[in-house]
């Protein structure tokens, strides 16, 4: 079953994106480089709960 989580900017902390991830337990969190409209640049976004 898919679980909806959000991606937060590592610099400013704003939650800009939502993604569907698998519900199984995993060791690492998803990290993607995406555009942050608050920082106005591409930053690393990490999976949050």
From Swiss-Prot:
One of its GO terms (biological process) is translation. It comes from the Bacteria. The keyword Ribosomal protein applies. One of its GO terms (molecular function) is structural constituent of ribosome. Disulfide bonds: none annotated. Keywords: Ribonucleoprotein, Ribosomal protein. GO terms for cellular component: cytoplasm; ribonucleoprotein complex; ribosome. Belongs to the bacterial ribosomal protein bL33 family. This is Large ribosomal subunit protein bL33B.
């Amino acid at each position: 079953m898919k679980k909806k989580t959000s991606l937060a900017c590592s610099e400013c902390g704003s939650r800009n994106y939502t993604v569907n991830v698998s519900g199984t337990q995993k060791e690492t969190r998803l990290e993607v480089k995406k555009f942050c409209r608050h920082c106005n640049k591409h930053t690393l976004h990490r999976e949050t709960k």
